[in-house]
Amino acid sequence: MATAFKNYTAQSIGTTAYYVISQNSGAFNGGVSGLTSGKAVIMVGCMVSNRLTTSIAIDVVHYQNAGSKTTYLCKSLAIPAGDAIEIVQGKIVLMTADDISVVSNTASSADVVLSILFDA
């Protein structure tokens, strides 16, 4: 399979974790799939925006190997009203069954765009 850039998006994320790559709310659901053997995904960007007129706090979590390890990319990070923040300012390598979740402290408050290089 050829290398390709992909964007995963989600709108109005709230107080239930949203798994961006599996496009699933509430429970981990497989994460990255369909990779060519020996290949990976490189996350090159992750932008989270606040849809509301009040501040929100977000968590962005990397789930490695189908959720066996969890690492916070940010925890309780405040995003001012109507603002956005770039979570990834470098690159993060994702493997098969890895995923990224976003959750907010406020219902229907956050949008996310996750940009990846697939089959790198």
Give each language-model segment a name.
Residues 67-99:
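Intrinsically disordered, low-complexity Pro/Gly/Ser/Thr-rich segments with frequent PxxP/GP/PP motifs
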